[in-house]
């Protein structure tokens, strides 16, 4: 091993030990200085990394909640997955104690997002099973913006049993983006807990009906895009989805329907 490589490893190890020994008071002090400086990107990103490697899970979550409440989009949740199983357990306990629905939705979404990154960890499946009942219970009463988050989260932690729920939202939800994200989440299941072949078999008719009947152009484009990823096709370019190019979307719709009806 070269000297430069040894130095790099030694530096990383020292950084890890430093972060593991960070106290709440030290993190609070750094946070206060960032507030005064209006959160310059480089320092904010470094602080976020330190939060994730520190043992101060409760303080980390406190900052995330402040960010949610103030709508500042400081992205403190980006490193929460670094807390591993301990972080998941903390969020599950917090979720069980939380009574405000909007906050429960945000916690469920954060849990699902973290678990999506941890799908190869041994705690993934068991943790998903704990979050799913809460997520599903929140879906019927949630307003559109919260429902969208929950539908996206369902794609990250759902299993074969959730195909029907997503299918219902795909075909009957009154919100166009909820319908669109349902298609995306069905596709996402193939990257998580459902085998692609099984998912293709169970969703082919759903996608065909949804794409055929969809009146909202953006939702239709997003459905086609999700379906082409799942079924390995190239019906529509990303640029056409982003720019909502009517002619290309309608052409892709015809191609998708023709394939899905086979």
Spans of features found by a protein language model:
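Alpha-helix N-cap/helix-start positions at coil->helix boundaries
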Residues: 69-70, 100-102, 144-145, 175-177, ...
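N-terminal alpha-helical scaffold/docking segments in eukaryotic complex subunits
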Residues: 1-87
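Alpha-solenoid HEAT/ARM repeat scaffold
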Residues: 73-74, 89, 104-105, 109, ...
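Eukaryotic tandem repeat interaction scaffolds
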Residues: 142-185
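Structural signature of alpha-helical solenoid repeat scaffolds
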Residues: 112-116, 155, 187-188, 224, ...
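Amphipathic alpha-helical scaffolding segments comprising HEAT/armadillo-like alpha-solenoid repeats
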Residues: 25-28, 45-64, 85-96, 117-139, ...
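Eukaryotic acidic, Ser/Thr-rich intrinsically disordered low-complexity regions
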Residues: 228-262
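HEAT-repeat alpha-solenoid elements in large eukaryotic scaffold proteins
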Residues: 59-71, 104-115, 140, 180-186
